[in-house]
Amino acid sequence: MADLGKKYCVNCLADVTNLRIRCAECQDIELCPECFSAGAEIGNHRRWHGYQQVDGGRFSLWGPEAEGGWTSREEQSLLDAIEQYGFGNWEDMAAHVGASRTPQEVMDHYVSMYIHGNLGKACIPDSIPNRVTDHTCPSGGPLSPSLTTPLPPLDITVVEQQQLGYMPLRDDYEIEYDQEAEKLISGLSVNYDDEDIEIEMKRAHVDMYVRKLRERQRRKNIARDYNLVPAFLGRDKKDKERERAGGTVGVGGPGGAVGSGSGATVVPAGPLGSSTAATPKRKITKEEKGQRTKLRALCQFMPQREFEEFFDNMHKERMLRAKVRELQRYRRNGITRLDESAEYEAARHKREKRKENKSIAGSKRGSSGGGGGTAGLGGGVGAGGGLGGGGGVSTIKEEGKDSEFSAIENLSGFELLSDREKVLCNSMNLSPMRYLTVKTIIIKDHLQKRQGIPSKSRLPSYLDKVLKKRILNFLSESGWISRDAS
């Protein structure tokens, strides 16, 4: 007699107690998986009817060839246990699955089926990528660990620590900035019966205190960055005196200390002094000292390195502006190449020297003229007149010798000439207006020839071939006309 507790397929009468497919529209239609997959139809049942899977929990998930005979209900208990207890806790997992399974069986079954089996090969990749994201902020960011890292203690002696009231282990001072800041929170206490307005007020006090602490730490960092503590203790002056004393030992002479306060720089002046200094600093001008004093309040908004770079860039800007003005002065004087600037500077130096000698001679001439008059009165008219006349002639000759452009400097157009053009006109004994006329005609004819316009040069009659040749050579050397035109 058939077992009443078993279920059979209505098509092939196979035992479907463990797993069967039940039709959702027909009554008492239960098929085995094989008949359902083949599309079996019995009576009013059709293969497109809805269905549901009925699991008795006693069939094997991995098939009859799997070792151990694990049922689907045990597999579900195993997955629930590993999710609850975690991988490796095999004793608790075995107790959760059932008393029939030992911890070793549970471990072997899970490793062989879920890790080394087909399911593990399909789900676990061969190379696991690194999905760990670094959420730490860069150095100096809002959440950077460097913000909470304490600064190293100051390198000062015990006497200096007592003088400053500095506590190196705490990196604090006996008298801090805003010493009364702790009074904001010293009397705060949170009670369970506080109202919302009281809680918000206490939070505001804490926020005010935190801001004061940040300002205190910011000022400490500024003092560290700009070395204000050594400057307060006078160490910078001692270092300057030591470096100055070290700079005196050498052939090149003593070194000079330039600047005041923490911005002072020591400039060694000699071969030995320059070799001892690793990075010699530039001299600080009086103008830059004034700018540093005016901008001292802005030091708190930038590091010392950026502050020094700012003044270095300003110094470079001044140097470039001076160089541009010098080049513009060369161009106004007709110099178009740098190799001509040395000759021009030498001539200018000589000219200034002659002017200086001329002024000295004029002052001497005035004093000697007065002396001659006295001598004439004391020694007689003839002798006085002779002395006075001789002095006047020698003075006129000296003045004519010192004056470089005395022949043309009072003529019209003299101020329109460059220094080289003045020398040229003076050497050719040519008036400035005549030279400017010839220069204009030559440049105009040269431009017309370059544009292909036929032109006939009509130079003035007072210009001979020698003067014309010299002027053409001068204009070509100065870059007014091309060399082939000369």
Curated annotation (Swiss-Prot):
GO terms assigned for molecular function: chromatin binding; transcription coactivator activity; zinc ion binding
One GO CC term, this protein: SAGA-type complex
Region (Disordered): 237-291, 343-377
Compositionally skewed regions (Gly residues) per UniProt: 247-262, 367-377
Domain SANT as annotated: residue spans: 65-118
Keywords: Metal-binding, Nucleus, Transcription, Transcription regulation, Zinc, Zinc-finger
Binding site for Zn(2+) 2: C23, C26, H45, H49
Cross-referenced Gene3D superfamilies: 3.30.60.90, Homeodomain-like (1.10.10.60), Winged helix-like DNA-binding domain superfamily/Winged helix DNA-binding domain (1.10.10.10)
One of the Pfam families matching this protein, by short name: Tri-helical_Ada2b_C
Compartments in which it is found: Nucleus
Residues engaged in binding Zn(2+) 1: C9, C12, C32, C35
Zinc finger region(s), ZZ-type: 4-59
GO BP term, example: chromatin remodeling
Superkingdom in the source lineage: Eukaryota
UniProt keyword Transcription present: yes
PROSITE patterns: SANT, ZF_ZZ_1, ZF_ZZ_2
Record function comment: Transcriptional coactivator.
Protein name as annotated: Transcriptional adapter 2-beta
Organism of this sequence: Danio rerio (Zebrafish)
Lineage start: Eukaryota, Metazoa, Chordata, Craniata, Vertebrata
